[in-house]
Amino acid sequence: MSYKLLKGGHLPDRKCREILELFCDDLTATQIAGISGVSRVTVNNYFRLIRSAIASFCEAGLLAGQRSHTLDAANSAVDVTSNPVDNPAYYGFYIYKGKVSTAWLKNICQASILQLQGKDDAAINGGSVPIFEGYHAIADFNDWRLYWLDGNTGIPAFSNALPEITGFWKHTKSRLQKFRGMNKSTLDLHIKECEFRYNFRNDDILTVLTGIISTPRYFKNEAYENYATAYKSARQS
């Protein structure tokens, strides 16, 4: 197959295929550079292209799901232009069609989460706490804490979601905590990669990923591009 959709890529298809296979084997850019003979900078550029396609794939599933409007997330077309750098790294976790899904939350703080956990009806109904109906848990990627929202009445089958989200959180922490001083502009890409790897852990990831990068629409997700642009612009300001 042709790998021309890896925009900006200048390597022959054979090398693109090799990088993709080694990416699926979960090797680092340094390891792949040593094996393939391609510079680490170039490998990292391809990593970003691959992760962007994965993020678009995950977001396409979220947007197609017509999630409840009460989900106060930055993933909808209306919210992606918000400035995520000025907000803590909080993500909502929920189960959708048997898969773990994640969404960056733009209007929340630790105090709000604790009030939600404590079922502070007065604060919630009074509007001082944002409503996150539909989420099973909220993850704080600053302090690496997971807050369960088992008091949320808008979520079905909480007990069924418990093992999946617990497994996903362990998987994600083990992958991301090894990064030191991760650029916040790449955090969403890494979280979406974790989401993808966890949800397809029982599948042939190379086959799934090959299908993703051969689909033009996953390289033209305007909502995701706006989201990434907001990260970049805010960091440069």
Tell where the protein language model's regions lie, with residue ranges.
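Residue-level recognition of single "structural anchor" positions
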Residues: 1-237
